[in-house]
Every structure is written in structure tokens, then in C-alpha cells.
Amino acid sequence: MANVLDELLDRGYIKQFTHEEETRKLLENEKVTFYIGFDPTADSLHVGHFIAMMFMAHMQRAGHRPIALLGGGTAMVGDPSGKTDMRKMLTKEQIQHNVDSIKKQMERFIDFSDDKALIVNNADWLLDLNYVDFLREVGVHFSVNRMLSAECFKQRLEKGLSFLEFNYMLMQGYDFYVLNQKYGCKMELGGDDQWSNMIAGVELVRRKAQGDAMAMTCTLLTNSQGQKMGKTVGGALWLDADKVSPFDFYQYWRNVDDADVEKCLALLTFLPMDEVRRLGALEGAEINGAKKILAFEVTKLVHGEEEAKKAEEAANALFSGGADMSNVPTVTIAKEDLGSTVLDIIAKTKIVPSKKEGRRLIEQGGLSINGEKIIDLTRTLNEDDFEDGSALIKRGKKNYNKIEIQ
């Protein structure tokens, strides 16, 4: 069996190991069952999760078995890692809705047929735990002194860390133990912000089960300045087409900085690394060709080849006049809406996520209709704006929508 570790290292996925040599030997000699956890705090995954799923997909293609662990139980507590304040508490119903939505998205990326991968929910074992038994069986293996020194708790101690959240590390560690016992899971993969929690899980399995347990962290998706990627004018870059249209998703990758093209191709596509390096080395106008390939490949993986082609054609239509404009994301309004302010209409049709965001966009000169920059918040949308049957809205530099009258 080929060792996928070399491929993962070459592509830049891996940030840290708990046991590097043991991990290499295990991946060389066994079909390894591993897991990545996803807390269902929203009803869609975003691009930060996508890099983790690509990590899983590379492992699966090399013959290993992924478990996608949905945190229906841990979401009841909330992960304090990387947060300065306590997360908003979700109801059981909200969490279950999110779990169901995320399951559907995951099936686009990972092959769950014939036991090749599993989706499990930690609510199945966490919600019925006896607290005293849990403390005796699991809590005894955790040192409070060590927990307090963990990076995920440090930044919260001054602001206040609830006892509810303090339990999160124990619960995540217990997840690994349950998966180890039930499915023979020997490895956890996760974002680098989960390092402290992952170490806790590895140590718990090694102490309690006396077996192999190890962890690898995946690099976070950051740009060349070290800032997290995946933020848009409307917020997170969601993988749900109802939250971020395939066209806007395509445009995000089409417009990444030149310095980030090679990294994104390596982490977010299956293109061979020789091709990734060739594309990443292009300069000047040629790098735009590499960006188009990046945008198409990532959109194809997330939304399917048909939607990727539509997004590509729409972009060509807008920027070179060479294709069908029908693929530009389109919203409709009633004739009675004519005469309303542009601000009201773009908020009502969800072209912008909120009226506040629309106001900010107009005040900063980032909105135009049919090429006319909108600078007046009271500017109305009128029949004259629909001379060609539709009005073309431009947000920022390269985000477009069409408005049509029903």
C-alpha cells in the first residue's frame, strides 16, 4: 500500500504529529481507520471544513477508512478553542437539523458505500452518559494543571471559562476512545487549533485501551499574509449553494492573490503536484489562467461539473463578452417593487446578507447598477433600469447578480 503521508506532506496538509515515525509505519503497513470531527454549529460546512474533507479524501484514495464524526453531543457544550467568548447555545432541534444538512454535503466528497467510510454522531454515546461513571472512568486520566496550560483554554481564563466548556476536552478525548473500541480507530486528524484536544484523546486511548493511538493536525487555510481565507463580503464562504451561489464561489477562487494560487491548488484540488507547481510558477497575465483552473476545479468538487461550467461561462460573459449571460445568479422582483430603494431591494432579495451590509457597500462605493455607481442611499430602482429586460448589479470588484421583473 502506497504511503499517503508523503503525498500529504508534499501538498502541505500536515502541521504537527503526535508520533511521526509510528504514523508512517502504520500507514505503510495497515488499512487505517481514522476520524475527523465536525461540530454542527451551522447547517452548512464552509471552506475551512473543505480542507479537512480533502485531507480525508486523500487518505481514503490511498486505501484508508475515514470516520466523519458529527458532534451532535459536543455541540451541546461548545468548543472553546480559538474563541474569546462562550459560543451561543443551540437547541437539540437546531443541532439535529444541522447534522442532517451536513451529512448530505459530506456525501459529495467522501465515498460512504460498502463500509468505505462511516458517518457517526457522538450524541449516540455522549447524551446518555452517567456523569459519575464518566468522571471515574475518564476524568481520572486528566490533569487539571495540564488542561489549564493548554492553548485552547489559556486565552479564555482571563475573560472567563465556564465549567461547561472546560469539559469539552474530556468529551473529545472520550470520542476517540469510543471510536477506537467500536471501530478500531487509531488516528485522529483535525485542524491545528484542535492540537490540545487531540493530544488529550491520544493519551486517553493509550492509557485506557493500551493500544495504538496517534494524531495529525492539518494546516489552516491562510493566505500569504497569514490571514484565514474563506471570508466574503457576505461572511463565510459556505459550501451550500443557497448560502453562496456557485458563481460567487467560483469568483472567490478566481480572485485569490497570485501568491496563494499554488497553495490553494495543492490543498483544494486533486491535480498532480507537478502540474500544481507548474501553474503556481506562472507570472504576469499567465497566472490568471492558473486562477481559472483553480476556480473551476474547486467549484467542480463542491458543486459538481455542470455548475462549475455554468459559473465559468458566466464569468467569461461578464469579463470578455464571450458567453451566455443566463448563468449569472439571478433574482426576481414583483412589478410593485419598482420605486423601492436599491438598498431595500438588494436586502430583500438576499443579494446582500443584510440592510446594514448593503448600506456599508453603497457608502464605500462598492455597488453599481448597469455600470452606474450607486452613491445615494435613497436611489430607487425604476423601470428605466430594465431596458434590456434585467438590471445588472455589481458588488465589489467582480461579484455580479441580475435582477429581473416577474
Swiss-Prot record:
Motif 'KMSKS' region mapped to chain: 228-232
SUPFAM superfamilies linked: Alpha-L RNA-binding motif, Nucleotidylyl transferase
Binding site for L-tyrosine: Y35, Y168, Q172
GO CC annotations, alphabetized: cytosol
Residue intervals passing through the bilayer: none
Subcellular location per the Swiss-Prot or TrEMBL entry: Cytoplasm
Signal sequence residues: none
EC number: 6.1.1.1
Official protein name in the record: Tyrosine--tRNA ligase
Organism annotation: Clostridium botulinum (strain Alaska E43 / Type E3)
Primary gene name: tyrS
